[in-house]
């Protein structure tokens, strides 16, 4: 049974047991999901015949944080290798709510803790995504950000 985090009622955590562990690149007995979205994607990747291999938070992409100027590690949600006709294609996929794909609306009169948190997260996420795009370009991969709309939610 997934554990529920009451700070965010939409957050769940648990272990995913793949039906096809040979497809998982990493330790298939140690696959952790941190949301129901991740669990849904894991199940889909595991069952999809066109998915040759996949992993969850196994890749490390260094990025420079705009908040402190230091290099940090970014662990994208998924890496996927897919058969597309005679060729294979690799993707790095991040799951995010659609509202996190646009910058926070500036309101100089209201600089609440929540607003400042959103600004920091927006800056941090953009740095991660820029690093992921550069990484993917070098490795002939594609970086995708999936939202609830992409997942049919």
Give the role of each language-model region.
Residues 1-153:
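Electrostatic, structured charged patches in enzyme active sites and in nucleic-acid/phosphate-binding
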């Amino acid at each position: 049974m997934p554990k529920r985090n009451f700070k965010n009622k939409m957050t769940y955590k648990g272990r995913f047991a793949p039906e096809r562990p040979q497809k998982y690149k990493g330790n298939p007995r140690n696959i952790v999901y941190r949301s129901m979205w991740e669990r849904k994607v894991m199940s889909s990747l595991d069952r999809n015949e066109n998915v040759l291999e996949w992993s969850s938070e196994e890749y490390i992409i260094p990025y420079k944080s705009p908040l402190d100027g230091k290099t940090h590690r970014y662990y994208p949600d998924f890496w996927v290798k897919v058969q597309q006709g005679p060729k294979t294609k690799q993707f790095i996929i991040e799951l995010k709510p659609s509202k996190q794909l646009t910058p926070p609306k500036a309101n100089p009169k209201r600089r609440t803790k929540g607003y400042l948190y959103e600004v920091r997260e927006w800056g941090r996420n953009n740095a991660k995504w820029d690093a992921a795009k550069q990484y993917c370009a070098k490795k002939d991969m594609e970086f995708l950000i999936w939202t609830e709309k992409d997942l049919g939610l």
